[in-house]
Amino acid sequence: MIGNWNYGTGRRKSAVARVFIKAGKGDIVVNGKPISDYFSRETSLMIVRQPLELTNHAQTFDIKVNVSGGGETGQAGAVRHGITRALIDYDATLKPALSNAGFVTRDAREVERKKVGLHKARRAKQFSKR
């Protein structure tokens, strides 16, 4: 806990989010912008709000987020992971519910590297019999 802020770091793909929460009225600010301005897709907004709605804290915390790296979906996932960790820092009794929903576990899937001699990570050149 930093002052009256609770902190959580979230990661997803190559995105990293630093999340600070404190008691408030439900404002979420991402990189200095309101969340609805920062994330253009409705699914991204839904992903970010999932841990708050699960724990019935959607209107009880003001959230400040610094997120960098990755794309929109990766950043939304990183913010969700960071909010989850910050909520656990605030109240450890929320951990079982968040864990059962799968929000505590860091999604370890990363982009597979491209291999030499292939078009992509696994896509080979088209094979011709003749």
Curated annotation (Swiss-Prot):
Q: Which GO terms describe its molecular function?
A: RNA binding; structural constituent of ribosome
One cellular component term (GO) for this entry is: cytosolic small ribosomal subunit
Q: Could you tell me which InterPro entries the record lists for this protein?
A: Ribosomal_Su5_D2-typ_SF (IPR020568), Ribosomal_uS9 (IPR000754), Ribosomal_uS9_bac/plastid (IPR023035), Ribosomal_uS9_CS (IPR020574), Ribsml_uS5_D2-typ_fold_subgr (IPR014721)
GO biological process, any: translation
Gene3D superfamilies to which the protein is assigned, alphabetical: 3.30.230.10
User: What UniProt keywords apply to this chain's record, in alphabetical order?
Assistant: Ribonucleoprotein, Ribosomal protein
Q: Which Pfam families match?
A: Ribosomal_S9 (PF00380)
Q: Which family does it belong to?
A: Belongs to the universal ribosomal protein uS9 family.
Please state what the protein is called: Small ribosomal subunit protein uS9
Source organism of the structure: Burkholderia mallei (strain ATCC 23344)
